[in-house]
Curated annotation (Swiss-Prot):
Belongs to the class-D beta-lactamase family. The active site is at residue 79. It is an enzyme of class 3 (hydrolase). It catalyses: a beta-lactam + H2O = a substituted beta-amino acid. This is Beta-lactamase OXA-133. Keywords: Antibiotic resistance, Cell membrane, Hydrolase, Lipoprotein, Membrane, Palmitate, Signal. A lipid is attached at residue 18 (N-palmitoyl cysteine). Induction: Is transcribed at very low levels, about 1,500-fold lower than those for blaOXA-58. It is a lipid-anchor. The gene is blaOXA-133.
Length: 273
């Protein structure tokens, strides 16, 4: 994405103020500000990691965490790209929500992936082989055109269609991710409403006390340093949408649940849930 970014930095742990103009898919502009919350800063410190939580409400974006510069730094999207992969595949009729992707008995990275599953089931299990198969069906040329059409991250997918989101060259910033997922939450992406609704249904993580939390995790294990994501949105009881993108440095010994733990604690701290 072509972005104009200006920032004023004070000699402290935080940015004093920050504004951004964006050329988004729907030509909106977002204002980005530092969210002053030392508690969330400490949440990341306590896990001995660096990270940022980007929150978008309407056109206002707030940054929290102990490494705010990550918000405008590019990282491989890892399995958060499954959201766009599914949108492209469904829109172009390379699959449908009822198709069963067959497991052929091969050894997979996790035993939970060693079964037949639909695209939605594979989304919830983050089953990489299913989405690699979908990417191969889409093909390199169409995938490149669609990623460019959506203006996702640096829009570079290279010459191998089934791993560019895991090891590069595709990269995206947390700010770009939160803008993308906010448009998905509001059904504003340039895909059919039906396709967007189907993908949103795949992303429901939790429903409690009138709040719905949608999201997709990502963990880039094959790059150094490793990168973790949890990107999605909260639908509040009154229907208001609050989008989020958590991005952090991961280590092999960390539990996968650390991303959800940090997100949920932070959302509660901010009175979003």
């Amino acid at each position: 994405m072509n972005k104009y970014f200006t920032c004023y930095v004070v000699a402290s742990l935080f940015f004093s103020g920050c504004t951004v103009q964006h050329n988004l898919i729907n030509e909106t502009q977002s204002q980005i500000v530092q969210g002053h919350n030392q508690v969330i800063h400490q949440y990341f410190d306590e896990k001995n990691t660096s990270g940022v939580l980007v929150i978008q409400t309407d056109k206002k974006i707030n940054l929290y965490g102990n490494a705010l510069s990550r918000a405008n730094t590019e990282y491989v999207p890892a399995s958060t790209f499954k959201m766009l992969n599914a949108l492209i595949g469904l829109e172009n009729q390379k699959t449908d929500i009822n198709e069963i992707f067959k497991w052929k008995g091969e050894k997979r990275s996790f035993t939970t992936w060693e079964k037949d599953m639909t695209l939605g089931e594979a989304m919830k299990l983050s089953a990489v082989p299913v989405y690699q198969e979908l990417a191969r069906r889409i093909g390199l040329d169409l995938m490149q055109k669609e990623v460019e059409r959506i203006d996702f991250g640096n829009a570079e997918i290279g010459q191998q269609v089934d791993n560019f989101w895991l090891i590069g060259p595709l990269k995206v910033t947390p700010i770009q991710e939160v803008e993308f997922v906010s448009q998905l939450a509001h059904t504003q992406l340039p895909f059919s409403e039906k396709v967007q609704a189907n993908v949103k249904n795949m992303l429901l993580l939790e429903e409690n006390n009138g709040y719905k939390i949608f999201g997709k995790t990502g963990w880039a294990m094959d790059i150094k340093p490793q990168v973790g994501w949890l990107t999605g949105w909260v639908e509040q009881p009154d229907g208001k949408i609050v989008a989020f993108a958590l991005n952090m440095e991961m280590r092999s010994e960390m539990p996968a649940s650390i991303r959800n733990e940090l997100l949920m604690k932070s959302l509660k701290q901010l009175n979003i849930i």
